[in-house]
Protein backbone atom coordinates (compact mmCIF):
# COMPACT_ATOMS: atom_id res chain seq x y z
CA UNK A 1 0.00 0.00 0.00
CA UNK A 2 1.65 3.22 -1.10
CA UNK A 3 1.65 6.26 1.14
CA UNK A 4 0.04 8.58 -1.42
CA UNK A 5 -2.98 6.32 -1.87
CA UNK A 6 -3.71 6.12 1.84
CA UNK A 7 -2.65 9.60 2.95
CA UNK A 8 -5.40 11.94 3.98
CA UNK A 9 -5.28 15.56 2.93
CA UNK A 10 -6.52 18.24 5.36
CA UNK A 11 -9.70 18.76 3.33
CA UNK A 12 -10.65 15.13 3.92
CA UNK A 13 -10.02 15.41 7.66
CA UNK A 14 -12.41 18.33 7.92
CA UNK A 15 -15.01 16.59 5.74
CA UNK A 16 -14.87 13.61 8.11
CA UNK A 17 -15.25 15.99 11.08
CA UNK A 18 -18.44 17.39 9.53
CA UNK A 19 -19.91 13.93 9.00
CA UNK A 20 -18.92 12.71 12.47
CA UNK A 21 -20.24 15.86 14.20
CA UNK A 22 -23.59 15.40 12.51
CA UNK A 23 -23.91 11.71 13.35
CA UNK A 24 -22.77 12.39 16.92
CA UNK A 25 -25.54 14.96 17.41
CA UNK A 26 -28.17 12.71 15.83
CA UNK A 27 -27.30 9.76 18.06
CA UNK A 28 -26.85 11.88 21.20
CA UNK A 29 -30.29 13.38 20.80
CA UNK A 30 -31.74 9.89 20.84
CA UNK A 31 -30.34 9.20 24.32
CA UNK A 32 -29.90 12.62 25.90
CA UNK A 33 -33.58 13.18 26.70
CA UNK A 34 -34.00 10.21 29.05
CA UNK A 35 -32.47 12.12 31.95
CA UNK A 36 -34.64 15.20 31.33
CA UNK A 37 -38.00 13.39 31.18
CA UNK A 38 -38.96 13.91 34.85
CA UNK A 39 -38.16 17.61 34.57
CA UNK A 40 -40.07 17.91 31.30
CA UNK A 41 -43.09 16.09 32.72
CA UNK A 42 -43.10 18.48 35.66
CA UNK A 43 -42.54 21.64 33.58
CA UNK A 44 -45.25 20.78 31.06
CA UNK A 45 -47.59 19.23 33.65
CA UNK A 46 -47.95 15.95 31.76
CA UNK A 47 -47.82 12.37 32.97
CA UNK A 48 -44.62 10.36 32.55
CA UNK A 49 -46.51 8.16 30.07
CA UNK A 50 -47.13 11.21 27.89
CA UNK A 51 -43.67 12.70 28.39
CA UNK A 52 -42.07 9.60 26.85
CA UNK A 53 -43.50 10.73 23.51
CA UNK A 54 -40.81 13.41 23.42
CA UNK A 55 -38.35 10.55 22.93
CA UNK A 56 -40.62 8.20 21.00
CA UNK A 57 -41.56 10.82 18.41
CA UNK A 58 -37.90 11.32 17.51
CA UNK A 59 -37.10 7.60 17.39
CA UNK A 60 -40.22 6.63 15.43
CA UNK A 61 -39.61 9.22 12.72
CA UNK A 62 -36.02 8.05 12.30
CA UNK A 63 -37.11 4.42 12.12
CA UNK A 64 -39.87 5.12 9.59
CA UNK A 65 -37.85 7.35 7.25
CA UNK A 66 -34.27 6.06 7.35
CA UNK A 67 -34.54 3.83 4.29
CA UNK A 68 -36.50 6.42 2.32
CA UNK A 69 -33.82 9.04 2.85
CA UNK A 70 -31.11 6.54 1.91
CA UNK A 71 -32.93 5.97 -1.36
CA UNK A 72 -33.26 9.73 -1.90
CA UNK A 73 -29.51 9.97 -1.30
CA UNK A 74 -28.95 7.54 -4.17
CA UNK A 75 -31.22 9.60 -6.42
CA UNK A 76 -30.39 13.21 -5.49
CA UNK A 77 -26.94 12.86 -3.98
CA UNK A 78 -25.66 12.09 -0.52
CA UNK A 79 -24.28 15.58 -0.01
CA UNK A 80 -27.65 17.22 -0.69
CA UNK A 81 -29.52 14.91 1.69
CA UNK A 82 -26.81 15.33 4.35
CA UNK A 83 -26.82 19.14 4.21
CA UNK A 84 -30.61 19.25 4.13
CA UNK A 85 -30.70 16.96 7.15
CA UNK A 86 -28.28 19.10 9.14
CA UNK A 87 -30.27 22.23 8.27
CA UNK A 88 -33.53 20.62 9.40
CA UNK A 89 -31.87 19.25 12.54
CA UNK A 90 -30.40 22.62 13.56
CA UNK A 91 -33.65 24.48 12.89
CA UNK A 92 -35.64 21.91 14.83
CA UNK A 93 -33.11 22.06 17.69
CA UNK A 94 -33.72 25.80 17.91
CA UNK A 95 -37.48 25.15 17.92
CA UNK A 96 -37.03 22.55 20.67
CA UNK A 97 -35.01 24.99 22.76
CA UNK A 98 -37.71 27.65 22.36
CA UNK A 99 -40.60 25.27 23.07
CA UNK A 100 -43.03 26.45 25.70
CA UNK A 101 -45.47 23.55 25.57
CA UNK A 102 -45.42 19.78 25.47
CA UNK A 103 -46.96 19.72 21.99
CA UNK A 104 -44.53 22.25 20.57
CA UNK A 105 -41.59 20.24 21.90
CA UNK A 106 -43.02 16.97 20.58
CA UNK A 107 -43.67 18.40 17.10
CA UNK A 108 -40.19 19.97 17.08
CA UNK A 109 -38.73 16.58 18.01
CA UNK A 110 -40.62 14.99 15.10
CA UNK A 111 -39.07 17.53 12.74
CA UNK A 112 -35.68 16.98 14.37
CA UNK A 113 -36.13 13.26 13.73
CA UNK A 114 -36.51 13.91 10.00
CA UNK A 115 -33.21 15.81 10.01
CA UNK A 116 -31.48 13.09 11.99
CA UNK A 117 -32.80 10.43 9.61
CA UNK A 118 -31.35 12.35 6.65
CA UNK A 119 -27.95 12.48 8.34
CA UNK A 120 -27.99 8.86 9.50
CA UNK A 121 -29.14 7.50 6.15
CA UNK A 122 -26.23 8.89 4.12
CA UNK A 123 -23.55 8.93 6.81
CA UNK A 124 -21.74 5.73 5.84
CA UNK A 125 -22.07 6.52 2.13
CA UNK A 126 -20.25 9.81 2.71
CA UNK A 127 -17.56 8.04 4.75
CA UNK A 128 -17.15 5.62 1.84
CA UNK A 129 -16.68 8.54 -0.58
CA UNK A 130 -14.25 10.45 1.67
CA UNK A 131 -11.92 7.61 2.64
CA UNK A 132 -9.63 5.97 0.08
CA UNK A 133 -10.55 2.30 -0.49
CA UNK A 134 -7.34 1.10 1.17
CA UNK A 135 -8.30 2.62 4.53
CA UNK A 136 -12.09 2.53 4.28
CA UNK A 137 -12.22 0.07 7.19
CA UNK A 138 -10.57 2.67 9.39
CA UNK A 139 -13.20 5.22 8.40
CA UNK A 140 -16.05 2.83 9.13
CA UNK A 141 -14.43 1.94 12.45
CA UNK A 142 -14.14 5.59 13.47
CA UNK A 143 -17.76 6.13 12.45
CA UNK A 144 -18.92 3.12 14.49
CA UNK A 145 -16.91 4.31 17.48
CA UNK A 146 -18.49 7.78 17.34
CA UNK A 147 -21.97 6.25 17.16
CA UNK A 148 -21.30 3.90 20.10
CA UNK A 149 -19.65 6.54 22.29
CA UNK A 150 -22.41 9.05 21.53
CA UNK A 151 -25.12 6.58 22.49
CA UNK A 152 -23.34 5.62 25.70
CA UNK A 153 -22.36 9.16 26.67
CA UNK A 154 -25.80 10.71 26.09
CA UNK A 155 -27.18 10.29 29.62
CA UNK A 156 -23.93 11.49 31.23
CA UNK A 157 -23.76 14.53 28.98
CA UNK A 158 -27.42 15.27 29.71
CA UNK A 159 -26.80 15.02 33.44
CA UNK A 160 -23.86 17.41 33.19
CA UNK A 161 -25.84 19.93 31.16
CA UNK A 162 -28.85 19.71 33.47
CA UNK A 163 -26.71 20.37 36.56
CA UNK A 164 -25.59 23.64 34.97
CA UNK A 165 -28.79 24.78 33.28
CA UNK A 166 -32.31 24.00 32.17
CA UNK A 167 -33.44 21.33 29.72
CA UNK A 168 -33.43 23.94 26.94
CA UNK A 169 -29.64 23.70 26.85
CA UNK A 170 -29.88 20.07 25.71
CA UNK A 171 -31.02 21.50 22.37
CA UNK A 172 -29.11 24.79 22.31
CA UNK A 173 -25.84 22.85 22.29
CA UNK A 174 -26.80 21.37 18.91
CA UNK A 175 -26.97 24.75 17.21
CA UNK A 176 -23.26 25.76 17.12
CA UNK A 177 -22.14 22.17 16.50
CA UNK A 178 -24.71 21.75 13.73
CA UNK A 179 -23.81 25.05 12.11
CA UNK A 180 -20.13 24.07 12.16
CA UNK A 181 -20.96 20.74 10.51
CA UNK A 182 -23.16 22.53 7.97
CA UNK A 183 -20.49 25.07 6.99
CA UNK A 184 -17.70 22.50 6.81
CA UNK A 185 -19.91 20.04 4.94
CA UNK A 186 -21.07 22.68 2.46
CA UNK A 187 -17.49 23.63 1.65
CA UNK A 188 -15.78 20.26 1.65
CA UNK A 189 -18.22 17.48 0.80
Segment roles from a protein language model:
Residues 2-187:
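Transmembrane-helix bundle of Major Facilitator Superfamily
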Amino acid sequence: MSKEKTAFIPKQYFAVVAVLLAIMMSVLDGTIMNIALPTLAHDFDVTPANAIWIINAYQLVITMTLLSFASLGDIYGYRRIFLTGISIFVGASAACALSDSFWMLTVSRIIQGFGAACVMSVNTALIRLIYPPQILGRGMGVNAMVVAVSAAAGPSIAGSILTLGSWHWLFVINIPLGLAALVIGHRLL
